[in-house]
């Protein structure tokens, strides 16, 4: 089977720096696996890698869509698999576990675009209460379904599927890999992670996080703002909360998401856990990948 390497972990764990180093060492290419970074304009708030930071390493699925365009997990699965087939050694880098697993395992996803009608043609944007209702319904009626509750389009799609002849969890998801996968999970103590998150957030504000959110709101009023960081800044701009409250919410939700993220990867994929603060981080990950590739056509 084709060998694929995954570099994942929470925000502020150093995925970008490590992936650039490893992709250079093994002559690989990087496939963005962060669902937000697929979209243009969400740069500061998603800590999107800059062109200069890419250091001539080929990156795929970055800045692919406008903020108000629909790009589903089905689209990612299709595009990612196509890239994998054409790349010598693909590195999937990001923290969107559902996206990563959909591309690497034999998930059968449908190409349904009905949610785009709800969001664009009708000019309808569901509010928080609507989202919470649909999430409760999905969990009650299809408790085995793994879905991204932070993405409203996917919540709506899963909710609409509740009325189909077969539950989505029963008909679409399987758990067999279609590639030979090595997953490196960058782990970090929660207190150190929180300090990093706070530091990064302050840096984002200095870089213009508020101005970026305001610009997206003005140019794409029907864009997805159900994203940690952008959602809270939007509330601040609407004068529903103050800046201190916005920052506290962003930090709290980021930490909660990181906790759930780790649990998800531990339960859903076989991972090699590496401590971010290990002084030999790059040496160890290099050796793990070298052993993984031993005997393959990459040597």
From Swiss-Prot:
Superkingdom assignment: Bacteria
Region described as Interaction with substrate tRNA: spans on this chain: 34-37
Chain sites annotated for binding ATP: 9-16
Site (Interaction with substrate tRNA): 96
Family membership noted in the UniProt record: Belongs to the IPP transferase family.
Quaternary organization: Monomer.
Name recorded for this polypeptide: tRNA dimethylallyltransferase
Lineage: Bacteria, Bacillati, Mycoplasmatota, Mollicutes, Acholeplasmatales
């Amino acid at each position: 089977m084709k060998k694929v390497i995954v570099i994942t972990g929470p925000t502020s764990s150093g995925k970008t720096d490590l992936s650039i180093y490893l992709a250079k060492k093994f002559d690989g290419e990087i496939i963005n696996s962060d669902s937000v970074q697929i979209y243009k304009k969400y740069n500061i708030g998603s800590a999107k890698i800059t062109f200069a930071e890419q250091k001539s390493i080929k990156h795929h699925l970055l800045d692919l869509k406008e903020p108000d365009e629909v790009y589903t997990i089905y689209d990612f699965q299709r595009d990612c698999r196509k890239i994998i087939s054409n790349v010598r050694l693909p590195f999937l880098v990001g923290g969107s576990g559902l996206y990563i697993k959909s591309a690497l395992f034999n998930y059968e996803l449908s190409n349904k675009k009905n949610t785009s009608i709800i969001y664009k043609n009708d000019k309808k944007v569901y509010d928080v209460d609507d989202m919470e209702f649909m999430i409760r319904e999905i969990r009650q009626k299809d408790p085995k379904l793994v879905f991204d509750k932070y993405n409203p389009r996917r919540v709506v799609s899963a909710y609409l599927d509740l009325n189909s002849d077969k539950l989505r969890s029963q008909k679409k998801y399987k758990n067999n890999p279609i590639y030979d996968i090595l997953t490196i999970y960058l782990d970090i103590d929660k207190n150190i992670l929180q300090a990093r998150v706070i530091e990064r957030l302050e840096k984002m504000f200095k870089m213009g996080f508020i101005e970026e959110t305001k610009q997206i709101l003005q140019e794409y009023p029907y864009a997805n703002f159900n994203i940690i960081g952008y959602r809270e800044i939007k509330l601040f701009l609407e004068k529903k909360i103050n800046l201190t409250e916005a920052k506290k919410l962003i930090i709290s939700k980021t930490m909660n998401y990181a906790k759930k993220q780790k649990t998800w990867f531990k339960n859903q994929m076989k991972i090699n856990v590496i401590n971010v603060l290990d002084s030999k981080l790059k040496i160890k990950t290099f050796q793990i990948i070298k052993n993984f590739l031993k005997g393959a056509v990459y040597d």
